């Protein structure tokens, strides 16, 4: 069977940062944020060349070990074969190791770019297969679902396959993220979780997660009670005591705040009237950023021109 044909032109993919869990929605809920990585991929005659600017430019590998490249390769295998060479340019803005979905962004950028640069790629790898592949690489669907679909997502596993639905978050919600200077490895944060939790805590989280869907989509005034968690944030506190303290301080002031993903970033769900005040609470140990909500998810864009901003 003949391998795939590839486009001669480069493709540009933009992927959003994401925040998973959102308090009670452990490994299920995700929110796409208005902070983006851009990747340009072109099929070349031979070799592999990677240029990286921004986050991770001094630490990320520039060879087959790069998660983006591994994701490209995995997708190309499913699409029917590898190109002879690749040229990749990365403009990274999503902080690494901070709980904002940088690994999911790399995975989604890689598989979306592979499909886009392959002629007939969408017929060979449809959107459902794309989500399943991203989940297989990442290990859980919450971040990759939000990264691919945008908006507010609920994801789950069914008979070994990833599934997700996209919902429209209320446009009154203004996420404010507090990013600390030091990362926490996802493996470290996950390693602190117990094998079992009390039934009463599981029941409480089920109720709060259901409430959170209503709060994020239609009734943001319920976000403070809806973001309560008993399954993971307390157990992870030893790895990020400053983050835990900030969440408690913000919530004590009536501000819905959670650990973003596996941490250590803290995310507050403010509104237009309170976002500036919330952002000012960062202090010197945090980089506070007021972000929009991303509605598009992973997107193939025209190549940048001199007029792009």
Swiss-Prot record:
Gene Ontology BP terms: threonine biosynthetic process
Keyword Cytoplasm: yes
Annotated pathway: Amino-acid biosynthesis; L-threonine biosynthesis; L-threonine from L-aspartate: step 4/5
Keyword Amino-acid biosynthesis part of the UniProt annotation: yes
Localization per Swiss-Prot or TrEMBL: Cytoplasm
Pfam families named among the record's database cross-references: GHMP_kinases_C, GHMP_kinases_N
InterPro entries xref list: GHMP_kinase_C_dom, GHMP_kinase_C_sf, GHMP_kinase_N_dom, GHMP_knse_ATP-bd_CS, Homoserine_kinase, Ribosomal_Su5_D2-typ_SF, Ribsml_uS5_D2-typ_fold_subgr
SUPFAM superfamilies from the UniProt entry: GHMP Kinase, C-terminal domain, Ribosomal protein S5 domain 2-like
Stated family: Belongs to the GHMP kinase family. Homoserine kinase subfamily.
Summary of the function given for this chain in its UniProt record: Catalyzes the ATP-dependent phosphorylation of L-homoserine to L-homoserine phosphate.
Name used for this protein in its record: Homoserine kinase
Species of the source: Streptomyces coelicolor (strain ATCC BAA-471 / A3(2) / M145)
Gene designation per UniProt: thrB
């Amino acid at each position: 069977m003949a391998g795939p044909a590839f486009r001669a032109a480069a493709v540009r993919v933009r992927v959003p940062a994401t925040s998973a869990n959102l308090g009670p929605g452990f490994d299920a809920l995700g929110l796409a944020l208005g902070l983006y990585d851009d990747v340009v991929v072109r099929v070349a005659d031979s070799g592999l060349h990677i240029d990286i600017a921004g986050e991770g430019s001094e630490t990320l590998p520039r060879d087959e070990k790069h998660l983006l490249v591994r994701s490209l390769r995995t997708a190309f295998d499913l699409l029917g074969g590898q190109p002879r060479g690749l040229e990749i340019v990365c403009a990274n803005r999503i902080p690494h190791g901070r709980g904002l979905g940088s690994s999911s962004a790399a995975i989604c950028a890689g598989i979306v770019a592979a499909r886009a640069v392959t002629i007939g790629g969408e017929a060979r790898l449809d959107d459902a297969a794309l989500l399943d592949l991203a989940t297989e690489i990442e290990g859980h669907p919450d971040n990759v679902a939000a990264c691919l679909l945008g908006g507010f997502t609920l994801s789950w596993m069914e008979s070994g396959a990833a599934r997700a639905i996209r919902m429209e978050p209320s446009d009154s919600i203004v996420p404010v993220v507090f990013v600390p200077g030091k990362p926490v490895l996802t493996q470290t944060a996950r390693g602190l979780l117990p094998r079992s939790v009390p039934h009463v805590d599981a029941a409480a989280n089920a109720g709060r997660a259901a409430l959170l869907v209503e709060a994020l989509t239609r009734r943001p005034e319920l976000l403070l009670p809806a973001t309560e968690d008993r399954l993971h944030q307390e157990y992870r506190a030893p790895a990020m005591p400053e983050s835990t303290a900030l969440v408690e301080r913000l919530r004590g002031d009536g501000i819905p705040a959670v650990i973003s993903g596996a941490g250590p970033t803290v995310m507050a769900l403010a509104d237009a009237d309170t976002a500036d005040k919330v952002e000012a609470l960062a202090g010197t140990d945090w980089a506070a950023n007021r972000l929009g909500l991303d509605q598009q998810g992973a997107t193939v864009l025209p190549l940048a021109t001199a007029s792009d901003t």
